[in-house]
């Protein structure tokens, strides 16, 4: 794994996903092409995993973190939606379905010219996978 600061720090911004099981959630995003570049602690059960896909970054963090750091409780509802572009929407949905992911909406060509499907990450957050329409 690389150092966490490959870019100048002032140029970085990324979403943080609060997860009940950090490693399981990271595996879901790794199936979408993200690569693990940082983990704390480095060995054992992680409380933080940094992922990259090209210039995009995401952090998967234990849902206990906000309460420990600033006394806020992470709720159980949808906390965000991730939108991820892939080379082949249908193939990606099939692979994630086979690995146990829940498909919320089957792939469909949208009016704005993309093919989009929605899945649920391991904590129930919606994740759109999008790409070119089927020709």
PLM feature segments, named:
Residues 21-36:
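Amphipathic alpha-helical segments
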